[in-house]
Amino acid sequence: MLNSLLDFLSHGLLRFSWWQVALFALAVTHVTIIGVTVYLHRCQAHRALELHPIASHFFRLWLWMTTGMLTGQWAAIHRKHHAKCETEEDPHSPQTRGIWKVFLEGAELYRAEAKNEETMRKFGHGTPNDWLERNLYSKYPILGISMMMVIDVALFGVIGLTVWAVQMVWIPFWAAGVVNGFGHFWGYRNFNSADASTNLFPWGIVIGGEELHNNHHTFATSAKLSNKWYEFDIGWMYIRIMSAFGLAKVKKVAPTPRLNKPKTVLDQETLQAVLSNRYEVMARYGKAVKRAYRQELAHLKEIGGEKYQLMRGARKWFHKDADGLDEPQKKLLPEIFANSQKLHTYFQLRQDLAAIWDRSTASREQLLAQLQDWCHRAEQSGIKSLQEFATRLRRYA
C-alpha cells in the first residue's frame, strides 16, 4: 500500500518522463495564452470576432481552471486601459507607474483594478452573465485552479505541483508583466499611435501574437495583429483554423489601402479612404522623411564640420510627430531647418497632414479642401519624393 502510494506520488497516472512533462506544461500554457488572446482579448474585449458557443465556453472553462480570471473583469480592465491609455487612470501603464512596477507587480495591479466597481460597471458590458458565470465561475474563482492542481498531481505525481505552478505564473508573467509592461516601453513601432505601445518582436508565437502590441493599439478592433509581411501572429492562425471549422467568424481586420488611377480633383471617396488608412499614410510618410534625412546627412558628411554632428544626432527622432518630441529635441529643430530647407518642408508638411484628421470639428468639405491643398503644396515643393507621395494620396479609393 505504502509502495503504491509512493510510486503514485513519484510518477502519477501517466508515468511520463521529465521531458514529456515539460512538453505537456508548454502545451497547456500555450492553450492558456491562446485563450487569453483569442477569447478574452480579441473576442470579448474588442469584439473583433465571434466564437461558436463550443469554442467560447471551452475557453471560459479552461481560463477559469488555469488562471482564475473572470471574463467580465478582464474585458473591463482592458477596455479601460485603451480608454485611459498612458494616463493616471490607466490600470497598468509603465509610463505613469514605472516599468518595473508593471513588470513585477502586473498581477497585483490587475487584482486591484478588478475591485473597482466603477470600472466593472462602465467597461464590463456585453460579457457573459449566464447561470454558469453567476453561480460557478464568479462565485468560486478559486475552485477552478484548485481542480487544475488536483489534475496535475493525479497525472504526474508530486512534479505535477511544478506544472501547476508554471501554469499559475504564465499569464501574470507574459501578459500582465511582459505585454502590459514592456509592450509600452521597449520595442519597435510600425505606427505613430497616440500612446507608447510597441511591438516586442515581429513573430508573435510565445504570447500568441500579443507581441505585436503597437499594431494592436493602432487597430484595436482588428482580429489580426500582424501587419507587415515579415510579421507573424499565431493567434490569427488559430482564428483562421477555427473559422474553417465554423467555430469563429471574423468581424473586422485592419484596413488595406486600395489604389486606383490618381484623381486630378479629390472627392469624398478619396478623403474617406485616406482617413481610414491614416496610420498607414503617416507611417509611409515617416519612411519618406527618414530617406530624405539620410540623403541630407550624407551630403553634410561630405562637407564635414559641426553641421554634420548636429544632424547626425537627430536622425533617430526627426521623423516623429512634433508632439512626441521632448523639449531638447524641439529646441534643435530651428538649427536643423536652418541647415536644410528640404527637411523644413518635410517637417511642416507632416504636421499639416496630421492636422487634417485632428480637426474633429471641421466639415467633410473643409477636410477635403485641406487635403486637396496639401497635395497641391507637396506637388509644388519641387521635391520629387513629396510629389510622388501626393500622387499616391490621389490614388486612394
Regions found by a protein language model. Give the residues of each.
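Non-catalytic, topology-defining segments of multipass membrane proteins
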Residues: 1-178, 222-397
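Active-site-proximal inter-transmembrane loops
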Residues: 124-131, 186-212, 216-219
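Alpha-helical architecture
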Residues: 39-40, 80, 170, 182-185, ...
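A cytosolic-side transmembrane-helix exit/cap motif
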Residues: 43-44, 181-191
